[in-house]
Amino acid sequence: MHPINVRRDPSIPIYGLRQSILLNTRLQDCYVDSPALTNIWMARTCAKQNINAPAPATTSSWEVVRNPLIASSFSLVKLVLRRQLKNKCCPPPCKFGEGKLSKRLKHKDDSVMKATQQARKRNFISSKSKQPAGHRRPAGGIRESKESSKEKKLTVRQDLEDRYAEHVAATQALPQDSGTAAWKGRVLLPETQKRQQLSEDTLTIHGLPTEGYQALYHAVVEPMLWNPSGTPKRYSLELGKAIKQKLWEALCSQGAISEGAQRDRFPGRKQPGVHEEPVLKKWPKLKSKK
């Protein structure tokens, strides 16, 4: 399509579209002018900037970079344009409002760059002035620091290896039949094994050691779980109560339960008999305030 140029106020950069738009049609407060008027305006602009104006046939063309979203309504369309110069006579115009912004940014960037350069120079001069006259940093200083860091790393590594070797030697010296010490392929440390052994030795159930209570439990409970014919009994609530009563009597006969506990296992409470169901305590009803 033939490039149709769009001219705005002379103080604002020109815009153009690759669209078939009628001449003198208002498009976002811009007017679509003929190429001849655009060439005249470009000649005036180049004359102000002391630049040779281009020939009419070599004017700049415009193309749409971003397609409009609504092609039927040009009053609601925002287009992003890009200018293509055939002859580099005039600088490409910027979009509306970007010329001043770019100049401001460039000015700020230049000032920031100058400030950073001056700060670097000051720091360099101050660092030089702080050093005493005739003093230079030895060339081997960096090498010495690197060597010292390497030595520190080696010592730490050697210490870790020694500690690991001691741990391996201690675990291998343990007996193979450690029982609960080895759990899923893991071997406990000697301190942990001693602590566990002490806890097992001091564990008591109703005043009896663990092994004594287990023997008493099996002696009392096992016969009650089987019928005389050798078939297992079907568990019921009555059977559980009988087992509990027999086990309690056996503990009392062994002297494992104190006399006070035999009279009242729970002080301050009335214990139901073996054949009695515990009665739930009824809570008093709260009187609602009217």
From Swiss-Prot:
Pfam families in alphabetical order: DUF4662
InterPro entries: DUF4662
Region of interest (Disordered), ranges: 105-156, 259-290
Segments passing through the bilayer: none
Residue spans of biased composition, Polar residues class: 114-130
Compositionally biased region (Basic and acidic residues): 143-156, 261-280
Record-linked PANTHER family: CHROMOSOME 22 OPEN READING FRAME 31, CHROMOSOME 8 C22ORF31 HOMOLOG
Name of this protein: Uncharacterized protein C22orf31
Gene: C22orf31
